[in-house]
């Protein structure tokens, strides 16, 4: 709870430093803490495709954990509901790509994306039996490849 309070204080101060105001909502489950910062004019803290948000999360985690001496807590930051919106949009997109892969029979490599986005892709398509996904390459150029599933041999 102390890490959460420290993270809240840091985020509100960060928002103020760019001339924005925000309110925080904290959700704590065991060692997992999620702090949501909501308000107007916070887009600068999200950045293109959430790249700045990831940096804000990393800095907030380091500052909060060091100040509290707690390095076991997992801290996740969301700003303006970006992560939920990104998950929904990315899930919709990769479902369409998977449908195209099945229709054409050709694999398709997605653009390079950070680890949290790759996890969304794999999770969104995990229940499908007509395609397979895997990641290839090295960060920051690691990408997900969606391929048609190998045909199942019929037992005759």
What are these regions (language model features)?
Residues 1-156:
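RNA-contacting regions in translation and RNA-metabolism proteins
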